[in-house]
């Protein structure tokens, strides 16, 4: 799915950008555990599925890593 010029970004991309900014600005430093996806959805006032898609984007960018049973963490800086 592509975006048209002049249209606002898709919601999951906006959420991914917001979380990425928090990581880049040091609010979530490398190695820190992120809130759960459900908690993030509540804090950002978006649907749970939106946060799940945003996390996929951040994982693909290498910004976060998920350890099953432990949670999602900010990846070490490269």
Residue positions per predicted region:
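Extreme N-terminal segment that seeds HTH/winged-HTH DNA-binding domains in transcriptional regulators
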Residues: 1-48, 53-56, 60-65, 76-78
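Minor-groove-contacting beta-hairpin "wing" of winged helix-turn-helix DNA-binding domains
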Residues: 70-76
């Amino acid at each position: 799915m592509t975006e048209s010029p002049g249209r606002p970004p898709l919601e999951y991309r906006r959420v991914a950008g917001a979380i990425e900014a928090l990581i880049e600005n040091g609010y979530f430093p490398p190695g820190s555990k992120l809130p759960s996806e459900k908690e993030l959805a509540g804090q950002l006032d978006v649907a749970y599925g939106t946060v799940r898609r945003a996390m996929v984007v951040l994982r693909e960018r290498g910004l976060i890593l998920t350890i099953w049973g432990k949670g999602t963490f900010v990846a070490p800086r490269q």
